Structure formats: structure tokens, C-alpha cells
Amino acid sequence: MSSRVLTPDVVGIDALVHDHQTVLAKAEGGVVAVFANNAPAFYAVTPARLAELLALEEKLARPGSDVDLDDQLYQEPQAAPVAVPMGKFAMYPDWQPDADFIRLAALWGVALREPVTTEELASFIAYWQAEGKVFHHVQWQQKLARSLQIGRASNGGLPKRDVNTVSEPDSQIPPGFRG
């Protein structure tokens, strides 16, 4: 087992017990590493060196500047928690997934690259409102994640086309055809 000794002065525990005043007086820097069974056991420190170390620790505990900043600069505003119904509930129009929904979806095995759009959320809510089923909030989020995964994958990851747009003819001639 390796250990780090923080002083060059090393003494056995028997020598320290026999004459601790002489050992500490000869110690460079007022500190001695005490070994027992060929391994470091503890450090013996003179009262003067202990006072120096405590003064240094107190000095380091104080701020390095005399400028005092307002406590409000250190306090981040608390986000107003969204009221999520306890237990199981039916889907309602104002339901929202949690702010860390994408991270949670990844934990459930659904990798979402983009957050849920308002259209996707509205479609999900409308469908499940009509169903009238009840689930816990986490279960609703899991259903939303799976719904997004299936919906986005069904079109090769592309957004759904608007059926009201007028299609434009392709002006390129495929290879092998004459133009």
C-alpha cells in the first residue's frame, strides 16, 4: 500500500512515546510523521506550528476581496412548478410534458433529436382526450415519446407533407431516359 508522507521528518511511534518533546524540538517545520508497523500512522505537530496552520486556514476561509455582493446575485429564481395531477388522470387540454422530456425519453430508449412541436402535442392530446383513458403523468410522457418515435419514423424522419400544397413537377430527367 503506497502512502504520501507530507514531511521529511519521520519517527517511529516508540521513539515519540519515549521522548516526544525532544523529537518535536528537532523536527523541521514543527511536524513529524509518526510510523507504526512500518506504515504512516499520524502526524505530530508542535503547538506553534498548529497555531500557524489554524491561522492560515482561517485566512484562506475569508473571501479574497473586500467587495460584498448582494445575496440576490447568487440566488437563481425558482421556476414556478407546473401543477401535475397526482395519481392517474385523463388527458386534459393544457397537459405538458416535463421540461427535461427529451432526456427522459432517452432513458426510456426513445432518442428524440428535436423537442415536441405544438402540432405533435396537440394531435397527441386530442387523440387521448377522445379515448378517455387514465394514466400517470410519467406514463403519458412515455406514450408521447413512443408516439413521436413512431410518427417521425413513418415518413423517414421527414415532416409530414401538407396535403393542401400544390405539387411542383420534377424538372430533372432520370439517367437512362432521353430528354
Curated annotation (Swiss-Prot):
Oligomeric and partner information: Homooligomerizes. Interacts with PriB. Component of the replication restart primosome. Primosome assembly occurs via a 'hand-off' mechanism. PriA binds to replication forks, subsequently PriB then DnaT bind; DnaT then displaces ssDNA to generate the helicase loading substrate.
Keywords annotated in UniProt: DNA replication, DNA-binding, Primosome
> Which residue spans adopt a coiled-coil conformation according to this UniProt entry?
none
Q: Which GO terms describe its biological process?
A: DNA replication, synthesis of primer
Whose protein is this, by species? Escherichia coli O157:H7
Name of the molecule in the record: Replication restart protein DnaT
Tell whether Endoplasmic reticulum is among the UniProt keywords: no
- Which cysteines link up through disulfide bonds? none
HAMAP family reported for this sequence:
DnaT
Q: Gene Ontology terms, cellular component aspect?
A: primosome complex
> Per its UniProt entry, which superkingdom is the organism in?
Bacteria
Q: Please provide an example of a Pfam family that matches this protein in its UniProt record.
A: DnaT
What role does it play? Answer: Involved in the restart of stalled replication forks, which reloads the replicative helicase on sites other than the origin of replication. Can function in multiple replication restart pathways. Displaces ssDNA from a PriB-ssDNA complex. Probably forms a spiral filament on ssDNA.
> What family name appears in the similarity comment?
Belongs to the DnaT family.
The segment annotated Disordered runs over 156-179
Task: Say yes or no: keyword DNA-binding present.
Answer: yes
